[in-house]
A protein has these predicted regions:
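Glycine-rich, basic loop-to-helix element that forms the pyrophosphate-binding segment
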Residues: 70-84, 305-321
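Flexible acidic/His/Gly-enriched loops in nucleotide-sugar-dependent glycosyltransferase catalytic domains
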Residues: 133-163, 307-315, 319, 341-421, ...
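Short, well-formed alpha-helical segments that are part of the catalytic scaffolds
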Residues: 14-25, 40-56, 254-268
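A conserved hydrophobic helix/loop-capping motif in glycosyltransferases and polysaccharide synthases
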Residues: 30-42, 246-258, 262, 269-270, ...
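Conserved nucleotide-sugar donor-binding catalytic segment
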Residues: 174-175, 179-188, 377-470
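A conserved acidic beta->alpha catalytic loop
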Residues: 38-52, 56-58, 68-70, 97, ...
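Short aromatic/hydrophobic "clamp" motif used to bind/position activated sugar donors
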Residues: 89, 326
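Catalytic core of nucleotide-sugar-dependent glycosyltransferases
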Residues: 224-243, 380-389, 429, 452, ...
Length: 512
């Protein structure tokens, strides 16, 4: 009898505990925690005043969770998250004054409608800049009132009730799901916010910026500087998720000494999300032996097929490329360390760019910079966006490739078909690069960076030293001038035909 009584009491106790847990969960579902990391002895009065004016959603309770923040915001927010049972948590910078009293109610309503929405903010970025700093992006949306400067910063209009972003800013971050904050990586006041958004993304949850006609908050201080240690930690952990993949295409043929230098320049890129696709059609195994030292590097994809023609060797990496952007690196050329980062930044942040190029230097076999009249002087005095049509005329007028070779440029994935088309056409042009640039520039502008971001090596083994190649190039220029002249009118048409006639006359005079 006693055993039956004990069993009944245990069942009753378990039922009470379950009921209490369910009641607690229900209370948590109707609870909002406002979490703030205090940097001084007390919270700013402006912050507290704006909090007192907030409208409390019907049926909800609200609590203020205040924690010490000087050890880092990720650690502080993690501590506060564990201390609160509230389903809805709103993490706010203490230097923020809320301007919309109904903001919390809006956030809760949005969460209740969108189960897959993990995190909401008042500003953010759709694409990160290659350096990982959200405020360097030109794809930002939302707005902020700056109290100190008495002005509003409007980055971009938010479409609809809310718009998805890659990362929201840490001024205000609201969640309906608890995930650990990366206090193991971030010990200051930067990068923790973008990192948290990417942690939500890893779990299939979206981040979004609230729609707004006017700023929802006012910022009363200055931004925290982006610490270098935090930036490096952020890129090491999230670059492959946050940044577009860039494919570096490296055809090589029996030049292992130069190739090794080229490969090392690709591996030294400051941009953190690259793949390097090497196609080797050497008839010997020197390059293959060299590549064994790089076997552990997951960024490199190497194949060796001596049966490939020179053009097939160019095409193989193009077909295997997975990147949003791509660039060739020929086995005797070099990249500057920041080439991909600088160029990917432009392509990801500006609309209407066909491709991006830069100044390049000529170097000799030893790597010494040498003069080259085809490269200097610069076509523009400062980094510039050149209208596509103007760039085409610049090429034809001077019959000089100021844009550069395939190593020099960075192209969007959409350019792959044009590159493939130019490389496979018969008869093959002697100006494969110029032909490609002119076709691409029919559909967009050229971004020219005046800094030197690549190096074109001049040496005895190049086909460009062959006089027959020079003659073929001259004929190709004459053909391009005539083809373009057919589409023009007036003086421009006349001048192009005259230039083509002059080239052909000079070739005839030399018996070519």
């Amino acid at each position: 009898m006693n055993k039956e009584k004990r069993d009944a009491e245990m069942e009753e106790q378990s039922a009470r505990m379950l009921e209490e847990e369910q009641q607690e969960e229900q209370r948590a579902d109707k609870k909002i925690a406002v979490i703030v990391a205090r940097q001084g002895e007390a919270l700013p009065s402006e912050f507290l005043m704006s909090l007192r004016l907030m409208e409390q959603p019907a049926g909800f309770t609200m609590e203020l969770v205040e924690v010490e923040g000087r050890a880092g915001l990720a650690a502080a927010y993690g501590q506060a998250m564990e201390a609160s049972t509230a389903k809805y948590k709103i993490y706010i910078d203490e230097r923020v004054r809320i301007l919309d009293p109904g903001l919390f109610a809006r956030i809760v309503r949005l969460f209740e409608k969108c189960a897959d929405l993990g995190l909401v903010g008042i500003s953010g970025t759709k694409i990160l800049s290659p350096d990982g700093i959200a405020f360097h992006s030109t794809r930002r949306i939302g707005s902020l009132r700056l109290a100190e400067e008495a002005r509003t910063v409007s980055w971009g209009r938010v479409l609809g009730e809310a718009e998805d972003v890659l990362a929201v800013d840490g001024f205000l971050m609201a969640t309906q799901v608890d995930l650990p904050w990366r206090e193991d990586l971030f010990h200051g006041a930067a990068f923790f916010d973008a990192a948290q958004c990417l942690e939500f993304r890893r779990r299939g949850l979206r981040s979004a910026v609230l729609g707004q006609e006017e700023p929802l908050v006012e910022f009363l201080g200055e931004s925290f500087p982006a610490d270098e240690a935090g930036r490096r930690a952020f890129l090491a952990e999230y670059a492959t998720e946050a940044l577009p993949l860039v494919s570096i295409l490296m055809p090589t043929h029996e030049r292992p000494e130069f190739f090794k230098l080229a490969l090392e320049s690709a591996l030294a890129q400051t941009y953190r999300h690259i793949e390097i696709i090497v196609s080797d059609n050497s008839e010997d195994d020197r390059t293959e032996e060299l590549m064994k030292a790089y076997a552990a590097d997951e960024r490199i994809n190497y194949t060796h097929d001596a049966g490939l023609s020179a053009m097939q060797n160019w095409l193989q990496p193009l077909e295997r490329a997975r990147g949003e952007y791509f660039s060739y690196l020929f086995d005797d050329d070099l990249y500057a360390p920041e080439k991909i980062e600088r160029m990917a930044d432009v392509l990801s942040m500006e609309d209407g760019i066909a491709f991006v190029t830069s100044h390049r230097c000529a170097i000799d076999e030893e790597g010494n910079i040498v003069a080259d009249l085809a490269i200097d002087p610069l076509p523009v005095e400062e980094t510039s966006r050149i209208p596509g049509e103007l760039a085409i005329y610049g090429l034809l007028e001077k019959q000089a490739n100021f844009i550069g070779e395939y190593t020099t440029v960075l192209l969007p994935r959409s350019a792959r078909e044009t590159v493939r088309e130019v490389l496979t056409e018969e008869p093959r042009s002697a100006l494969l690069d110029v032909e490609c640039w002119m076709r691409l520039l029919e559909h967009g502008d050229l971004l020219y960076i005046v800094d030197t971001l690549s190096y074109f090596r001049k040496h005895d083994g190049q086909s460009s030293n062959d006089p027959a190649v020079h003659i073929a190039c001259a004929r190709a220029w004459a053909r391009l001038l005539r083809e373009r002249a057919e589409r023009e009118s007036g003086m421009r048409r006349k001048k192009m035909f005259e230039q083509a006639d002059l080239i052909e006359m000079m070739l005839r005079a030399r018996g070519r």
